[in-house]
Amino acid sequence: MKRQTLIFLGVIFLFVWGCATPGQKFIDITYFGDHEKTQTGQVGIAPFQDKRIDMDMGYVGYRILLDNSQETYFVNGMNLSDTLTRIVGIYFEKNGFTTTRVNPWELTPDGVIKASKGFKQIVAGQINKFECRAKKKGATTDMILDIDLTLYLGISDKNALKTIPVSMTLERTELTFTREKLEQFVNQALEEVFQKALVF
């Protein structure tokens, strides 16, 4: 019986230790929120600008493993700016708007006047910080997600520019960490960001 217990514990140890492997990993970031299509009109969406310093344009975060090696996570497509631009478009479309990609526009009221012709609203965004830091501790993984964005909403009928700073830090502990759980963590956070920041 003692021998069987030792074998069982050995299997559990190998499972906990061996499930994680260092290196590059990729996750899908998208928008899953459900909305009633109560809005109408055309929205122009400019590309998000990534202002993070010394980070790859697709970088999302990392996880430190038990042996201090590291998994590094990137968004599929290797372009976080393009991903967030696409997600904002999905958010507006799920609320009933139609969307069109537009060129970057001057982030001033004059810029709104020049760029918003034919649109109900125009949108731009800036990534100041976006990183998930995770550390494996035995069978669990502690995650800290920092998101800092600046959203710009140009309202055409008022020729007005609304600047919307968004900053949040979220923490979560997962008993069994997987790529899908990291995706869920990030996607839920972004859903909260856009639903609270871009209110109609």
Residue map of PLM features:
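Short beta-strand->alpha-helix linker/helix-N-cap micro-motif
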Residues: 89, 93-111
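Feature marks short, surface-exposed loop/turn motifs that line or immediately flank catalytic pockets
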Residues: 52, 131, 170-172
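C-terminal/domain-edge helix-coil "capping" segments
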Residues: 19-41, 96, 141, 152-200
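Bacterial N-terminal signal peptides that target proteins for export
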Residues: 1-7
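Bacterial N-terminal signal peptides
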Residues: 8-17
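Surface-exposed short loop/turn segments
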Residues: 20-30, 104-159
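A structural "domain/chain start" motif
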Residues: 19-91, 197-200
